[in-house]
């Protein structure tokens, strides 16, 4: 399996026998088979299809505990899957984009609606997974759709309604899909007011 992984992504993006304490905000956890950093949704999809049940997907590692004994699994970190673009009043963001970054891009483009996200320490995927929110705003207020893959690499687009977003919950809590990105709809606003919020 290890040689197969090295064919799917760059050698420097695969850390074998890696301690999870380096990849969680709590700074604890034992070793895993490898931590793998795909650089695109395509690489993430290929890894998902290859590793299936032998893997765990992790974003920023915010509020995640890993047992000191470690895990007999591969960990796919989405931190390098971070393409982001702004078109009209919409932002498209890959799963590994930080919540702070998406809020910053919105502000730079005079778009309001994501101010609440600036202080959330996770990624877009983590934010969608738990319908993250703060300061009277949450993901369900601005998301249009989310993109995901199953463990066979099949892609699916989830509409806002299909996401079943509620307090710290989404449809992804109850299924095995891996979030790859999302589209957010915002509104034009005053840049100075947005930055001051």
Feature map (PLM): residue ranges:
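Preference for bulky hydrophobic residues occupying beta-strand positions
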Residues: 36, 76, 93, 146-148, ...
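Acidic/polar active-site rim loop that often engages polyanionic ligands
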Residues: 86-88, 127-128, 177-181
């Amino acid at each position: 399996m290890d040689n197969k992984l090295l064919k799917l992504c760059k050698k420097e993006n695969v850390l074998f026998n890696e301690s999870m304490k380096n990849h969680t905000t709590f700074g604890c956890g034992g070793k895993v088979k490898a931590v793998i950093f795909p650089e695109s949704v395509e690489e993430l999809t290929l890894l998902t299809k290859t590793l299936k049940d032998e893997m765990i997907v992790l974003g920023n590692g915010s509020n995640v505990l890993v047992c000191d004994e470690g895990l007999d699994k591969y960990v796919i970190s989405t931190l390098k899957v971070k393409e982001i673009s702004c078109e009209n009043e919409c932002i498209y963001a890959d799963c590994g984009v930080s919540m702070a970054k998406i809020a910053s891009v919105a502000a730079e483009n005079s778009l309001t609606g994501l101010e609440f996200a600036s202080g959330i320490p996770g990624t877009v995927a983590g934010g969608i997974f738990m319908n993250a929110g703060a300061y009277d705003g949450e993901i369900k207020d601005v998301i249009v759709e989310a993109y995901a893959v199953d463990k066979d690499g099949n892609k699916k687009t989830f509409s806002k309604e299909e996401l079943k977003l509620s307090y710290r919950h989404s449809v992804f809590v109850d299924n095995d899909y891996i979030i790859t990105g999302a589209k957010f709809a915002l509104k034009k606003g005053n840049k100075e007011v947005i930055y001051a919020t």
